[in-house]
C-alpha cells in the first residue's frame, strides 16, 4: 500500500512493488517561478540568507553547519561600523569546529610562512660585526 508524507517543502511518496507494475498517473507540477529557494543567489529577495545556495559549497550542511550559519548570519545582519566585529565568538566557534575535521576543512597555508627566512641579511650583519671587532682589536 502506497502512502505519501510531507516534510517541509518535500513530498515523499512510498510505493510497493505492485504500484511499480502499473503505469504512473502522477501529474508533474511546473516549477514555481516565485519559489524563494530557486536561483536567487545567496541573498533572497526578502533579505534572508539562502542556505541552499550552491555558492556556499555545502558549508551550511556539513558537521560545522550550525556554527557556520551562526557566524555567517551574525556577519550578514551586523549593524556595527566595522561589519562583523560583533561576531568574533561565532567565528571562533566555527573555526574550533572546523579544526576538528581537517579532512573536510583543510586550512590554507600561506606561502610566506612556508618560505624560510632569507639568511643573507643576517649573515651580512654578522660579517660586518666580525670585521668591526677585528678592526677594534
From Swiss-Prot:
Transmembrane segments: none
Short sequence motif named Cx9C motif 2, residue ranges: 87-97
Descriptive protein name: Mitochondrial intermembrane space import and assembly protein 40
Transmembrane helix keyword on record: no
Disulfide bonds: 53-55, 64-97, 74-87
Residue stretches of biased makeup (Acidic residues): 106-116
InterPro entries registered for this protein in UniProt: CHCH, CHCHD4, Cys_alpha_HP_mot_SF
Chain's role: Central component of a redox-sensitive mitochondrial intermembrane space import machinery which is required for the biogenesis of respiratory chain complexes. Functions as a chaperone and catalyzes the formation of disulfide bonds in substrate proteins, such as COX17, COX19, MICU1 and COA7. Required for the import and folding of small cysteine-containing proteins (small Tim) in the mitochondrial intermembrane space (IMS). Required for the import of COA7 in the IMS. Precursor proteins to be imported into the IMS are translocated in their reduced form into the mitochondria.
Pfam families: CHCH
Listed Gene3D superfamilies: 1.10.287.2900
Domain notes: The CHCH domain contains a conserved twin Cys-X(9)-Cys motif which is required for import and stability of MIA40 in mitochondria.
Organism annotation: Bos taurus (Bovine)
Amino acid at each position: 500500500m502506497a502512502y505519501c508524507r510531507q516534510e517541509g517543502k518535500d513530498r515523499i511518496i512510498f510505493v510497493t512493488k505492485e504500484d511499480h507494475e502499473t503505469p504512473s498517473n502522477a501529474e508533474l507540477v511546473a516549477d514555481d517561478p516565485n519559489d524563494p529557494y530557486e536561483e536567487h543567489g545567496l541573498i533572497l529577495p526578502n533579505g534572508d540568507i539562502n542556505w541552499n545556495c550552491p555558492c556556499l559549497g555545502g558549508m551550511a550542511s556539513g558537521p560545522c553547519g550550525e556554527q557556520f550559519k551562526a557566524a555567517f548570519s551574525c556577519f550578514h545582519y551586523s549593524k556595527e561600523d566595522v561589519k562583523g566585529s560583533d561576531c568574533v565568538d561565532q567565528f571562533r566557534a566555527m573555526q574550533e569546529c572546523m579544526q576538528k575535521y581537517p579532512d573536510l576543512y583543510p586550512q590554507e597555508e600561506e606561502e610566506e610562512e612556508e618560505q624560510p627566512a632569507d639568511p643573507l641579511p643576517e649573515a651580512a650583519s654578522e660579517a660586518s660585526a666580525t670585521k668591526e671587532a677585528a678592526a677594534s682589536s
